[in-house]
């Protein structure tokens, strides 16, 4: 997927849902753990050299798996490239659990499935589709038969 560099830079400067200095190791063999400022903004994970304003990279958190590796560590790997694994080291077990949860919940697909789940619950309780008032209930991305939590 292609992204406009200026748009990504602008997005990286927005308020982060989560940010911290974490140890990070890239997917290349022999890569060493380096301290990085890591910021979660919407469904992008930006990483920066400490004390620099421009990100050195970004991961789009779609079609990926976030896994807890050990007490303080987690990884991200992409379904279409399982051999490419990004490793992260947190300062505590609690911080690690928080990051895994935040990253898992950041994907568009997770948000869409959550929307479908709550839409279905409201429909059961009220008999009304809450998306009808916005004129979008018929769009394919909002169809209930495609959603399962």
Swiss-Prot record:
InterPro entries: Boi1/Boi2-like (IPR045188), PH-like_dom_sf (IPR011993), PH_domain (IPR001849). GO terms for cellular component: cytosol; early endosome; recycling endosome; trans-Golgi network. Residues 15-108 form the PH domain. Coiled coil: none annotated. SMART domains: PH. GO terms for biological process: endosome organization; receptor recycling; retrograde transport, endosome to Golgi. This is Pleckstrin homology domain-containing family J member 1.
């Amino acid at each position: 997927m292609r992204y406009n560099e200026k748009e990504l830079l602008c997005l990286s400067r927005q308020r982060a849902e989560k940010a911290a200095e974490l140890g990070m190791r890239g997917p290349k063999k022999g890569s060493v753990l380096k301290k990085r400022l890591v910021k979660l903004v919407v469904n992008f994970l930006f990483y920066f050299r400490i004390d620099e304003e421009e990100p050195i990279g970004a991961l789009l958190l779609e079609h990926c798996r976030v896994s807890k590796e050990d007490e303080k560590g987690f990884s991200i790997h992409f379904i279409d490239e399982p051999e490419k694994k990004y490793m992260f080291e947190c300062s505590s077990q609690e911080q690690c659990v928080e990051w895994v949860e935040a990253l898992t919940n950041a994907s568009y697909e997770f948000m869409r499935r959550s929307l479908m789940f709550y839409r279905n619950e409201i429909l059961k309780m009220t008999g009304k589709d809450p998306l009808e008032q916005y004129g979008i209930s018929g769009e394919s991305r909002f169809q209930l038969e495609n959603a399962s939590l």
